[in-house]
Design a protein with these regions (language model features):
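Active-site-proximal alpha-helix that buttresses catalytic centers in soluble enzyme cores
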Residues: 1-305
Length: 305
């Protein structure tokens, strides 16, 4: 018979096992490789209305997650603030497994960006590794949702799969996730579209912004489903498909243009994650030793004085 007066045994805190205790974590030591962001377009195309570059803003945002890392950025086109300049004079100390990690600031496979990175690496001879782009990733859908809400096209809070009829003529009743980069980019945008549809409770479809046949097919599909206020949400930071070009495309297909992703703290977090993924894959992070692990709380485990 169980004694009801007896206290239950105290459960000691469990140690987290495995190498990846935190997806952003790796062992920090003096000489951590630099993080170089490859910004699509030219320096002029990547400038915002306030004159500040998307690369500079993203560098500040990524620095919040990786303050111990040297962060640079360079543009894949033009002759100012180029990627080749950012890859020049990287520290090749013996305590580094490589000089740097290049993170493309694109949300999907982008042939032009990949080719420019290869050219810059060949030109400089930099010992760097290249990560995947920023997408597909679940946080991209959140950023797209935020941009649509800021423009008044959708509700700011999640609808949680409940379809709600738009109350006015400004809210969207269909969304097109615009991809830039060809078939691979459309596939990545399709993943984001599914996640965004789950957030909004609306029909969300991917389309290739650079292919009018793809746009026509998707817009026709939305119209057949009853959509009269479709919105194009570009899954791009901005320089890949300028705003004026998007506005012309939207007018041609009777849709409204949404804002590009731009620099965002969530995108900065994804960039930091991509950086950590490369270092972890190279074995930079080592499993903690028994001495490095914190001792469990409890009188039996107090360190000897």
């Amino acid at each position: 018979m169980r004694n009801s007066d007896r206290l239950p045994p105290r459960e000691l805190p469990k140690r987290r096992s495995g190498r990846h205790r935190n997806p952003l974590s790796f062992d920090n030591w003096f000489g951590t490789p630099a993080l170089i962001m490859a910004v699509p377009g030219t320096a002029e195309q990547a400038q915002g209305a306030d004159g500040e570059s998307i690369g500079a803003r993203m560098a500040d945002l990524v620095r919040a997650y990786r303050p111990e890392v040297t962060i640079r950025y360079g543009h894949i086109e033009g002759d100012r603030q180029t990627l080749a300049e950012a890859l020049t004079d990287l520290d090749d100390g013996e305590d580094r497994p490589l000089s740097g990690v290049v993170v493309p600031l694109v949300t999907a496979p982008h042939p032009a960006t990949s080719a420019a990175i290869d050219d810059a690496m060949a030109q400089t001879g930099a010992d760097v590794r290249v990560t995947e782009g920023l997408g597909p990733h679940p946080m991209l859908a959140e950023v797209l949702h935020l941009r649509l809400a800021e423009a008044g096209f959708v509700r700011a809070d999640r609808m949680r799969l409940i379809s709600v009829t738009a109350r006015n003529t400004t809210m969207a009743d269909g969304v097109i996730v615009g991809a830039v980069g060809g078939e691979g980019a459309v596939g990545a945008a399709g993943v984001t579209a599914v996640l965004l549809a789950a957030r909004l409770g609306l029909t969300v479809l991917p389309a290739d912004l650079e292919d009018e046949a793809s746009m026509e097919q998707v817009v026709s599909h939305l119209r057949q489903g009853g959509s009269v206020r479709p919105v194009i949400a570009p899954s791009a930071l901005g320089p890949e498909f300028p705003a004026d070009r998007l506005a012309d495309l939207a007018e041609r297909f009777g849709a409204r243009p949404g804002a590009a992703l731009g620099a965002d703290s969530l995108l900065g977090k994804i960039a930091a994650l991509r950086y950590a993924e490369v270092l972890n894959s190279l074995g930079v992070e080592q499993p903690p030793t028994a001495e490095e692990l914190p001792a469990p709380v409890g009188s039996r485990h107090r360190p000897e004085s």
